[in-house]
Amino acid sequence: MRRVAPALFLLLVACSSVVLYERAESDTLYFGTGKPDGSAVTAAEWQQFLREEVTPRFSGFTHWEAHGSWKDVPEESHVLQLIHPPGHEADVAAIIDTYKKRFQQEAVLQVRGDVWLRLR
């Protein structure tokens, strides 16, 4: 029994340190800011879009400004990173469709992947 107890103890310690990750999906969306009339989506318009369209659908997200190009034309853009449980495809599609209509955009680039996450 004295030999089994240390082995059992080590097994319990090893099992207690197992870190569990949760499956999720990651959507990274790239929004161009150039409008057909030559103007650009303003910072205030972008913040309003986030407030009205993104925040009600996702409780947390990250966004940042970027410099990109579309069809060889450089333009400022916004990148939106969404990490969410599976099953939010309709919410992501609604955000994309609304942005395209509101700001007269041809397209929004969407990059999707499966991820494993945990909060530490």
Regions found by a protein language model. Give the residues of each.
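Short, glycine- and small/hydrophobic-rich beta-strand elements in well-ordered beta-sheets
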Residues: 55-73
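Short amphipathic alpha-helical segments
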Residues: 45-57
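Terminal, regulation- and interaction-focused segments at domain boundaries
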Residues: 24-43, 80-83
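Glycine-rich, aromatic-bearing surface loops/beta-hairpins
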Residues: 18-24
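Positively charged n-region of N-terminal signal peptides that target proteins for export
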Residues: 1-3
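Helix-rich interaction surfaces within compact, conserved domain-sized segments
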Residues: 74-120
